[in-house]
């Protein structure tokens, strides 16, 4: 009798041997991959790892490289920039400013409210006072007064009376 050999179970199937064609194809693939190893042709002169052009395009450029701003080579004096003064309101002639104040809608509305007997807030009242004071100043500069119209009417009435008395 033969000594019994360990029994092989069906679970451990024998590995299939590759055919000569399959072995040759695998060898060709390995050789092709081995040929591709190393640097790309011309990489020594071109200077680097840029195997494909897309690599350089995706990388963000360093802003410090290639600045086009001129750099002074000699010692130069610093040019101090003069700050422009903030634009102030253009100076109007007293006559133009007076006309603007007389046609001011907000001032008219607040004065009408005052005449109607309403009380204004402290802020509104101070604004009205400031505007009325400015109108007084301008009228004094221009030599006008509130009573000019009334005086003219009185002067005309007196002239009319004088004409009547003279008998013209």
UniProtKB/Swiss-Prot annotation:
Annotated InterPro entries: YihI
GO biological process: ribosome biogenesis
Domain of life: Bacteria
Segments of skewed composition (Acidic residues): 146-158
Pfam short name (any one): YihI
Biased composition (Polar residues): 48-57
Keyword field contains Isomerase: no
Segments for region (Disordered): 1-99, 143-168
Keywords associated with the record: GTPase activation, Ribosome biogenesis
Biased segments, Basic and acidic residues type: 19-29, 159-168
Disulfide bonds: none
Free-text function comment from the UniProt entry: A GTPase-activating protein (GAP) that modifies Der/EngA GTPase function. May play a role in ribosome biogenesis.
Subunit structure: Interacts with Der.
Family annotation (HAMAP family): GAP_YihI
Protein name: Der GTPase-activating protein YihI
Organism: Escherichia coli O157:H7
The encoding gene: yihI
